Swiss-Prot record:
InterPro entries: Cyt_P450, Cyt_P450_CS, Cyt_P450_E_grp-I, Cyt_P450_sf. One of its GO terms (cellular component) is membrane. Its EC number is 1.14.14.69. Pfam families: p450 (PF00067). It is an enzyme of class 1 (oxidoreductase). The chain crosses the membrane at residues 6-26. This is Ent-cassadiene hydroxylase. Belongs to the cytochrome P450 family. Its main location: membrane.
Length: 518
């Protein structure tokens, strides 16, 4: 009898909970959500993504072509809106920028980004605004970027000499440009950030590579963030955290070594002059010493800012440069025109400087066209809705993640003629730029969360590209034809070229010797 009463009580309790949920749901106003594909229990819309393409930006474009430029998806229990037109992007990133100023964090990215406390992934807040202000007014000003001109020129000259030696050695196997260009980018960012080459660089890059692999795919914790069990069983967040701890340890060593060096210089009476390349770390240590910033520049702050510098600057430029070289090999006409412009600008010189490339309009068009076709982040870093709002007549509830498919927008035939073709001339006499105001072309984002390192990334990219075109002609290895180049992309946050780019340099203008370049 007692058992029957217990069962009855339990049944009534369950019924009460269900009725309460039904009543609560009925009392809520029905939302006019954006259209989207049909969903399945638990996984939501995921089956539509995995069935179409390993590159999620391609799958999303295919779905948007059917459901419209603003589309609702469910990533497990996480609501997401996909934006695939300039008009909707402008509404989200400009007119309602503040409402969408937060970041969407997966469980793995949260672990890798210090709990979402770095500049890239931190939520919109006073702290984030002050950290970004330090970046924009102290680390990434035009004057600061120009101050590293000598660093860029020396590192690029070193690469050119290595390639000239490879060309002299002959052979048809080609040079692995992915390795060479990645090393160049990492050396530039290390010297600019901490004042010299870093003995811990390879350790840091190895940990970064592991972290990048973990954030490529969604884990069960990303699909069900409210579930503690999902968080416990998910492997990627744990691996991401382990990688981040390795990277943090390297950065803390670098900071301490620099502090020790500055103390030794001060004790020896060398002072600021010897300390002195005024790298990013030196600037941050000076701000730490002086105090007075709204957010104290603690060692923890220095760690996350250097982390953003290392990871951001060493990723974008080499990815884009590899795509440019691949496209130029597939389009000999554009290659010849770009080479002619560079060689005319620096005729008779054995070394390109940044002063030589200021007026190279066609080179800049080539870079723009590569950014259009191969935006490093095909989906802009996702925003998160801070308050319920409406976009294009549709309700967007608070907490919704918003993904702008810039890859699809940059291939929209309504805005781009022959959108799949590599045609730098489309930017001739065209005011469209990537600074955040032309919403059909936003490779670096727009609004409050636009990439703060645009000028630094472009400076690294332009000089390297100009130098490779100035000194060398290029051919593909082992008799490969341009049409045989694999132009597939890697899946994940960054759409790099899937296969390694191997090319054979043929020296046309011999570089200066190491002694002349120093």
């Amino acid at each position: 009898m007692e058992d029957n009463k217990l069962i009855l009580a339990l049944g009534l309790s369950v019924l009460f909970v269900l009725l309460s949920k039904l009543v609560s749901s009925a009392m809520k106003p029905r939302l006019n959500l954006p259209p989207g594909p049909w969903t399945l229990p638990l996984i939501g819309s995921l089956h539509h993504l995995v069935m179409k393409s390993p590159q999620i930006h391609r799958s999303l474009r295919a779905l948007s072509e059917k459901h419209g430029p603003i589309m609702q998806l469910w990533m497990g229990e996480v609501p997401a809106v996909i934006v695939s037109s300039p008009a909707v992007a402008e509404e989200v990133l400009k007119h309602q920028d503040l409402r969408f100023a937060d970041r969407h964090l997966t469980a793995t990215i949260e672990e890798v980004s210090f709990g979402g406390r770095d500049v890239t992934f931190a939520p919109y807040s006073e702290r984030w605004r002050h950290l970004r202000k330090i970046c924009m007014q102290e680390l990434l000003t035009a004057a600061r970027v120009r101050s590293f001109q000598g660093v860029r020129e020396r590192e690029v000259a070193r690469l050119v000499r290595e390639l000239a030696a490879d060309a002299g050695a002959g052979g048809d196997a080609g040079v692995n440009l992915n390795e060479r260009i990645s090393k160049l980018a990492n050396d530039i960012v290390m010297v600019s950030s901490v004042g010299g080459r870093c003995s811990h660089r390879d350790e840091f890059l190895d940990a970064l590579e592991v972290a990048k692999k973990q954030i490529t795919w969604l884990s069960v914790a990303d699909l069900f963030p409210s579930s503690k069990l999902a968080r416990m069983v998910a492997v990627a967040p744990r691996k991401g955290l382990a990688s981040r701890k390795r990277m943090e340890l390297v950065i803390r060593r670098i900071i301490q070594e620099r502090k020790d060096q500055l103390m030794d210089d001060s004790a020896a009476g060398a002072g600021e002059a010897a300390a002195g390349k005024d790298c990013f770390l030196d600037v941050l240590l000076r701000l730490q010493k002086e105090g007075g910033t709204p957010v104290p520049v603690t060692d923890e702050i220095i760690v996350v800012l250097l982390f953003d510098m290392f990871t951001g600057a060493s990723e974008t430029s080499p990815t884009v440069l590899i795509w440019i070289l691949a496209e130029l090999m597939r389009c000999p006409r554009v290659m010849a025109k770009a080479q002619a412009e560079v060689r005319q600008a620096a005729v008779g010189k054995t070394r390109i400087t940044e002063n030589d490339i200021v007026g190279l309009s066609y080179l800049k068009m080539v870079i723009k066209e590569a950014l259009r076709l191969h935006s490093p982040a095909p989906l802009l870093n996702p925003r998160k809705c801070r308050e319920t709002t409406q976009v294009m007549g549709y309700d967007i509830p608070k907490g919704t993640s918003v993904f702008v498919n810039m890859w699809a927008i940059c291939r929209d035939p309504n805005y781009w003629e022959d959108p799949e073709e590599f045609k730098p001339e489309r930017f001739e006499n065209n005011c469209v730029d990537f600074k955040g105001n032309n919403f059909e072309f936003l490779p670096f984002g727009s609004g409050r969360r636009i990439c703060p390192g645009i000028n630094l990334g472009l400076a690294n990219l332009e000089l390297a590209l100009a130098s490779l075109l100035y000194h060398f002609d290029w051919k593909l290895p082992n008799g490969m034809l341009p049409k045989d180049l694999d132009m597939q992309e890697t899946p994940g946050i960054v759409a790099a070229k899937l296969t390694t780019l191997n090319m054979c340099p043929v020296t046309q203008i011999a570089p200066s010797s190491a002694e002349d370049a120093s």
